[in-house]
Regions:
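Short, acidic, metal-binding catalytic loop of nucleotide-sugar glycosyltransferases
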Residues: 67-78
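Glycine-rich, basic loop-to-helix element that forms the pyrophosphate-binding segment
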Residues: 109-126, 183
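Conserved donor NDP-sugar-binding/catalytic core segment of glycosyltransferases
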Residues: 139-176
């Protein structure tokens, strides 16, 4: 066997082994790894939460999104929302203002600088002990914020993610036929969280 053939075989089999580890070995390792119990310490009162939403021309979604966050099963006095309008020109700002809830703050970012800058701008003024990020077209189940915050009762928890389900307007999670990739991704997250 020539050196070139040997090198090609090593690259091929090494690459195949790497792909196999990513899709089979890593999940299997997570599954077999023993779960570790978390030490939870309940706070005297729920921590303050700031929900941050970056929006660019989200006129169609922004009102439903903000109202969905305001309707969370979480103490109203411990929840506020910051919407950063990233140079929107479609009336997004007016819709947020019309909501008229003192827990909602609108920041205008001009000129448009992108989602990352919008999120950073919101973080500069956020007052919550816990920050929850939301896309401008995302809706949460009523207990989402409460469940996210509950995970922080364990001092070793540094961040928490939720499960993402892509739905068309009016569609339910049952009827969405959520993609295999998202099911796989959510399954891995669950294993990593044990």
């Amino acid at each position: 066997m020539a050196v070139v053939d040997l090198a090609a075989a090593v690259v091929f089999w090494g690459g195949l082994a790497l792909v196999a580890y990513v899709y089979v070995g890593y999940p299997l390792t997570l599954r077999l790894w023993p779960a570790r119990p978390l030490r939870k310490t309940a706070a005297a009162e729920p921590p303050a939460v700031t929900v941050v939403i970056a929006a660019f021309n989200e006129r169609v979604h922004i009102e439903d999104t903000v109202r969905n966050k305001l309707a969370q099963d979480y103490p109203a006095g411990r929840l506020d929302i910051i919407v950063v309008s990233d140079g929107s020109v479609d009336g997004t700002d007016d819709i947020v203002r019309r909501i008229g809830d003192p827990r909602v703050t609108l920041l205008r970012q001009e000129p448009r600088q992108g989602k990352t800058m919008a999120l950073n701008r919101a973080l500069e003024v956020a007052t919550g002990e816990i920050i929850v990020f939301s896309d401008a077209n995302s809706t949460y189940q009523p207990d989402t914020v409460r469940r996210l915050v509950a995970a922080f009762e364990a001092p070793e928890v540094g961040y928490v993610t939720g499960q993402l389900h892509y739905l068309e307007r009016g569609e339910t999670a049952v009827g969405s036929g959520s993609g295999a990739y998202m099911r796989y991704e959510n399954w891995l997250r669950q294993l990593e969280s044990r």
